[in-house]
């Protein structure tokens, strides 16, 4: 007798559930996507004990025909595709017919549905077996209750995390769905308390504000662009609003949230050098394309897709993000922080030993005003905005530990630069490089220097504070970016050629990238086994640091493995600009300071240093008047901040 036999349908469904239904958040995702496919305008999600006890999803969609209710729980039964051709042009969220039978095989499911023109139907299934099926009173749409998850597979329960973690995963799923479908009203209720609600009015900024906070919504910029195959639209944050991880970037393909490293990388690349190292923007990007160009049938949970013409899409995404950011005035304005302090402040007297309290918005965010250490001095305490809804407040707390890279968060280098003449570090030659950004950068009048680190200047619209190190670093960066690569005429010989020794593996990598190194001025010649000789170096190398600079550039190639000439030159320019820039606590005379301010507007990007830190922050005249309480501020309704329509 043969050893191979066919598994029964219940066991097969349980095996399939292992891939599709990993945790309560998986149930929320699958059921909510079914509701979206049913053209629902409202989807209410109710969970108890983080979904470990029950998950309920109610929608106002098309409902299920009475004859199809039981059939919907058969494996691979679906209304969304009919033949093999449909599999390559999927336009719905689901299409495999796996979700409902997988859920029903490991849980207790009660489904009630109606199509509007007929009597409702109800079915009760547990462990894959139908317990009851018949007519029921129901409003149009579908109401499905899932309870006792994994009751018959207790081993699966061991791999679930704490209720807090499981709830966080559900919240993340609902957030992504709401961002992908701003025209659908979502609500999420946990243990009887509503924690999220979106209006479903199509205003994406309002959804962002409900999830990430009102200030985040205000700092989002619209992006839009297309080519013959792709259409990109959505919102990205200004460079001053960042997070420590990539998880706040939501990228959708035809309104389906997906994970794609190349697209995420392109989105970040669109900011060029405007982001600080290790910081990432908030973004909500949707890419509309012909379904033929994307294969969504490559991952059990459909989180990953395979794209045709991906390089073309990567270029388009990077370009539209870059264009959107370049059109903005990127000088951080302190108006939002001043408004927050003056319209919702509460002044208390703190003893000398008390630690200064800061806004609840971010536990690690520095306060706008540092309190005096002397006893009895006022400490500013910001309160939660009364304009935000309870749902917005709840989700602000959800993200309260994330930093916002405001101008007050930029810390100057505390080390004192030892005396080198400032005139050697600040070039007084003002070259004519054009004024690409001059229209967006103000005409500044120099006032003075603060702490040997910041330059104070004024313009017609208020006070500007310029970080002198960041300013010259930006000027140097754009100079070196152009100079690196002009190797034929700008080489200087070493008195004694350098001999660089490496391991066999590293030597092979260097040989592979010799062309990149040569294009940037490092002409390495083989010199024995696993060794190279360097006879000359570019003239832009810092005097006395030629060998260190050469080794550092080679180390970049070894670390990256794959590096284009463009990327290599950018990295080298960043290194050189930082090494030759004036440091904090370095005194400049008036002539040197004015020369620095005069060169800054000539930069292609005068707003950020190459590492992404802001060069300048701005106090408008209105901000100053508010700080001194010379004017009062009126409150505006929360929704008005993100209303795209005029009255």
From Swiss-Prot:
<dbReference type="InterPro" id="IPR014762">
    <property type="entry name" value="DNA_mismatch_repair_CS"/>
</dbReference>
<dbReference type="Pfam" id="PF13589">
    <property type="entry name" value="HATPase_c_3"/>
</dbReference>
<comment type="similarity">
    <text>Belongs to the DNA mismatch repair MutL/HexB family.</text>
</comment>
<comment type="function">
    <text>This protein is involved in the repair of mismatches in DNA. It is required for dam-dependent methyl-directed DNA mismatch repair. May act as a 'molecular matchmaker', a protein that promotes the formation of a stable complex between two or more DNA-binding proteins in an ATP-dependent manner without itself being part of a final effector complex.</text>
</comment>
<dbReference type="InterPro" id="IPR014721">
    <property type="entry name" value="Ribsml_uS5_D2-typ_fold_subgr"/>
</dbReference>
<dbReference type="InterPro" id="IPR013507">
    <property type="entry name" value="DNA_mismatch_S5_2-like"/>
</dbReference>
<feature type="region of interest" description="Disordered">
    <location>
        <begin position="346"/>
        <end position="378"/>
    </location>
</feature>
<dbReference type="Pfam" id="PF01119">
    <property type="entry name" value="DNA_mis_repair"/>
</dbReference>
<dbReference type="InterPro" id="IPR042120">
    <property type="entry name" value="MutL_C_dimsub"/>
</dbReference>
<dbReference type="GO" id="GO:0140664">
    <property type="term" value="F:ATP-dependent DNA damage sensor activity"/>
</dbReference>
<keyword id="KW-0234">DNA repair</keyword>
<dbReference type="InterPro" id="IPR002099">
    <property type="entry name" value="MutL/Mlh/PMS"/>
</dbReference>
<protein>
    <recommendedName>
        <fullName>DNA mismatch repair protein MutL</fullName>
    </recommendedName>
</protein>
<dbReference type="GO" id="GO:0006298">
    <property type="term" value="P:mismatch repair"/>
</dbReference>
<dbReference type="InterPro" id="IPR038973">
    <property type="entry name" value="MutL/Mlh/Pms-like"/>
</dbReference>
<dbReference type="GO" id="GO:0030983">
    <property type="term" value="F:mismatched DNA binding"/>
</dbReference>
<dbReference type="InterPro" id="IPR020667">
    <property type="entry name" value="DNA_mismatch_repair_MutL"/>
</dbReference>
<dbReference type="GO" id="GO:0005524">
    <property type="term" value="F:ATP binding"/>
</dbReference>
<dbReference type="InterPro" id="IPR020568">
    <property type="entry name" value="Ribosomal_Su5_D2-typ_SF"/>
</dbReference>
<dbReference type="Pfam" id="PF08676">
    <property type="entry name" value="MutL_C"/>
</dbReference>
<dbReference type="InterPro" id="IPR014790">
    <property type="entry name" value="MutL_C"/>
</dbReference>
<dbReference type="InterPro" id="IPR037198">
    <property type="entry name" value="MutL_C_sf"/>
</dbReference>
<keyword id="KW-0227">DNA damage</keyword>
<dbReference type="GO" id="GO:0016887">
    <property type="term" value="F:ATP hydrolysis activity"/>
</dbReference>
<dbReference type="InterPro" id="IPR036890">
    <property type="entry name" value="HATPase_C_sf"/>
</dbReference>
<dbReference type="GO" id="GO:0032300">
    <property type="term" value="C:mismatch repair complex"/>
</dbReference>
<dbReference type="InterPro" id="IPR042121">
    <property type="entry name" value="MutL_C_regsub"/>
</dbReference>
């Amino acid at each position: 007798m043969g050893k191979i036999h066919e598994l029964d349908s219940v066991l097969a469904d349980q095996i399939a559930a292992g891939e599709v239904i990993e945790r309560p958040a998986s149930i929320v995702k699958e059921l909510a996507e079914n509701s979206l496919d049913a053209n629902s305008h409202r989807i209410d999600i109710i969970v108890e004990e983080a979904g470990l006890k029950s998950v309920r999803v109610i929608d106002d969609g098309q409902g299920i025909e009475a004859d199809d209710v039981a059939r919907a729980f058969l494996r691979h039964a679906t209304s969304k595709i009919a033949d093999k051709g449909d599999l390559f042009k999927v336009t719905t969220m689901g299409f495999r017919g796996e979700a409902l039978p997988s859920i029903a095989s490991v849980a207790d499911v009660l489904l009630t549905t109606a199509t509007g023109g007929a009597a409702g139907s109800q079915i009760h299934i547990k462990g894959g077996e139908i317990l009851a099926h018949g007519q029921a009173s129901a409003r149009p749409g579908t109401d499905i209750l899932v309870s006792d998850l994994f009751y018959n597979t207790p081993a699966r329960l061991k791999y679930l995390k704490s209720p807090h973690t499981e709830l966080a995963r559900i919240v993340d799923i609902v957030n992504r769905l709401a961002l992908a479908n701003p025209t659908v009203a979502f609500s999420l209720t946990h243990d009887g308390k509503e924690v999220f609600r979106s209006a479903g009015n199509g205003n994406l900024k309002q959804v962002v504000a409900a999830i990430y906070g009102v200030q985040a919504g205000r700092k989002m910029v619209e992006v839009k662009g297309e080519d013959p195959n792709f259409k990109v639209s959505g919102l990205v944050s200004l460079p001053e609003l960042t997070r420590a991880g990539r998880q706040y970037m939501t990228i959708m393909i035809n309104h389906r949230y997906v994970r794609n490293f190349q697209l995420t990388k392109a989105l970040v690349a669109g900011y060029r050098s405007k982001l600080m190292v290790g910081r990432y923007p908030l973004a909500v990007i949707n890419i509309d394309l012909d379904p033929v160009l994307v294969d969504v049938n490559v991952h059990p949970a459909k989180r990953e897709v395979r794209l045709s013409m991906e390089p073309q899409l990567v270029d388009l995404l990077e370009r539209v993000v870059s264009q959107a950011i370049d059109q903005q005035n990127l000088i951080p304005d302190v108006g939002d922080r001043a408004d927050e302090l003056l319209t919702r402040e509460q002044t208390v007297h703190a003893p000398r030993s008390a630690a200064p309290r800061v806004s609840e918005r971010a536990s690690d965010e520095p306060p706008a005003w540092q309190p005096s250490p002397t006893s009895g001095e006022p400490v500013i305490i910001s309160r939660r905005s009364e304009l935000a809804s309870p749902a917005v407040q709840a989700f602000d707390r959800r993200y309260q530990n994330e930093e916002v890279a405001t101008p007050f968060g930029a810390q100057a280098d505390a080390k004192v630069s030892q005396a080198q003449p400032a005139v050697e570090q600040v070039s007084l030659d003002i070259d004519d490089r054009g004024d690409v950004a001059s229209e967006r950068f103000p005409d500044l009048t120099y006032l003075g220097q603060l702490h040997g680190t910041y330059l104070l200047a004024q313009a017609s619209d208020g006070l500007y504070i310029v970080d002198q190190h960041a300013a010259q670093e930006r000027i140097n960066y754009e100079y070196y970016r152009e100079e690196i690569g002009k190797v034929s005429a700008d080489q200087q010989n070493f008195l004694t050629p350098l001999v660089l020794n490496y391991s066999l593996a590293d030597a092979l990598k260097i040989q592979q990238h010799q062309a990149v190194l040569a294009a940037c001025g490092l002409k390495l010649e083989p010199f024995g086994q696993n060794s190279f000789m360097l006879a000359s170096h570019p003239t832009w190398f810092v005097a006395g640091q030629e060998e260190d600079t050469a080794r550092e550039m080679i180390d970049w190639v070894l670390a990256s493995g794959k590096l284009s000439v463009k990327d290599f030159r950018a990295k080298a320019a960043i290194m050189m600009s930082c090494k030759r820039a004036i440091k904090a606590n370095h005194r400049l005379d008036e002539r040197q300071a004015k020369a620095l301010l005069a060169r800054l507007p000539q930069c292609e990007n005068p707003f950020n240093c190459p590492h992404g830190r802001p060069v300048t922050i701005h106090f408008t005249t209105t901000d100053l008047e508010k700080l001194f309480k010379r004017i009062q501020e009126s409150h505006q309704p929360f929704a008005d901040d993100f209303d795209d329509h005029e009255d």
